[in-house]
Amino acid sequence: MTSTEGTGGGDGKGISGFSDIERRSILDPHLSVLELLRRPSDTRPHEALKGEVSDIVGNCAGTTGTGNGSISQSWQTIHRNDSCLSVVPERCPSQATAAGILSSSDTSEDEPDAVNSPSAVHQQLHATPPQKHTKSLEDYRSLNVGIPLVLPEDSNNINNNNKNGSTTGSNGEEDDNDTITKSLNSSSNSFIMPKLSLSQKTQKFRILVLGRPGLKFYHSIPKKYQHMFELPRSHDPAEFKQYTGILVVFQELKEMVSLLNRVCQCNPNRPVIPVCQSGQRQQVRNLLESLLKNRLVSLLYPPVVVNNQPDLLGMFRFLQELSKTVSDNSDMDAEEPNNGSKRLKRSLQRKKKKFIETSAERNGRPHKKRHNNEKVNRWVLWGVSLTLGVGVGYCISHLVSSTWISLTTNPLGPVDPESVSKDLFVFDRQELKLGEMDMDSDHPFGHALFLFKQALKQWNLAVKQFLGRHLSCMERIGPANCLEWPTSDEHTNRVLALGYVML
């Protein structure tokens, strides 16, 4: 027995020494990780492995049995932390969602309660009876997976616990469930609805068709222009403010007067377009003239005969152009809010002026018309007239002065033969150089031209003396600014030409 025990003890020592060698290294050089994990565990007693496993799983070591002998000594360096038992490294989606919803204020209050209060993990571990057989590393892995998750308890349970055991809570604190609801509502309403302002509406061009034959006239309008017209919805004059103008269709003048009275009740007044029957245009014009003078109504377009298709098409084109102007102006309301009303007012004034002119022509009143051919720039006419006047005046003054001089000059005498050597001709004791002698003076035409030039010169001198007498007062006012007339013929001609221009 002794030898057997000694042998058994020697074998036990040999086995323990071999296991100590195996525990020094995690991996064997000739074995894979899977084979290392499936290696059979040693048969050490339960008390020997209890100290090693207790550093890993805490209180679970006393109830779950011995661990695998292949776990190395590096696992023993992990210190015990009881607060980590409620923390699972692998989180499920429900736990992640719950952690995202809860606020940071809740975790600080629940941490000490989770450590002190017995959780489901503690109850499960203590309730498990101790087992004598050993478990491998796979058993511990399955044990970790089987640990239930510690999720936040229901609000009803929390309230019951607070009523039974807790005395630190106050009545003024908000419940966790309410806090979660508020945070979800505030996060979901992140979109802010912009404020819409209906104070400035876009101006739309619309013409109201008013009168008993209005429905028939509306259906006779071409489809191209029908979108600009609308039929009345009621007989209230306050409805007229929504329209740009009012088209009045009538059969008798009494209807026209009653319709215009309704239009006058609208403030501000809307411009009208009268559509009369054949033979009523002149009467309608006379009636409208009195209303326009008193500013009771305004005219958008002259009266149109309902059977006259060219006049109707002209009215439709005018309204279409006016609608484009109003629509273009509505895009610029932020910069120029009153620009559309000004343009509409200008167009109404032009149409009103045209209507008055046509009515004056029909009544036989004289009216001045300006054709396109007469729209010539006046400055061009004035420039051409001044140029022609100066040129003609200069020519006349030159001819008159030359003729006057030739007439007043004494005739030439006989030539003195003694002056030939001196390049001079002496005529009646007057010397004349060769360069100054007129070779054409023997001809009658040349002599007449010479006399005409001399006459113009003499006329120039006479006019100069006449102007000098009337301008002598300037010498008395300012002797420094006295008018000194030049003696040469060139200056004389210029002064005479200036006199003609001034005249």
From Swiss-Prot:
Annotated CDD domains: psREC_Atg32 (cd19929)
Major localisation: mitochondrion
Cellular-component GO terms for this entry: mitochondrial outer membrane; phagophore assembly site membrane; vacuolar membrane
GO biological process terms held by the UniProt record: autophagy
Localization per record: Mitochondrion outer membrane; Vacuole membrane; Preautophagosomal structure membrane
Segments for region (Disordered): 98-138, 151-186, 328-370
Bilayer-crossing regions: 380-396
Disulfide bonds: none
Biased composition (Basic residues): 342-354
Entry keywords, A to Z: Autophagy, Membrane, Mitochondrion, Mitochondrion outer membrane, Transmembrane, Transmembrane helix, Vacuole
Comp. bias (Basic and acidic residues): 355-364
Residue stretches of biased makeup (Polar residues): 116-126
Membrane topology recorded in Swiss-Prot or TrEMBL: Single-pass membrane protein
Domain of life: Eukaryota
Biased segments, Low complexity type: 155-171
Function: Mitophagy-specific receptor that recruits the autophagic machinery to mitochondria and regulates selective degradation of mitochondria. Mitophagy contributes to regulate mitochondrial quantity and quality by eliminating the mitochondria to a basal level to fulfill cellular energy requirements and preventing excess ROS production. Recruits ATG11 to the surface of mitochondria. Also promotes autophagy-dependent peroxisome degradation.
Similarity comment text for this entry: Belongs to the ATG32 family.
Protein's UniProt name: Autophagy-related protein 32
Upper lineage: Eukaryota, Fungi, Dikarya, Ascomycota, Saccharomycotina
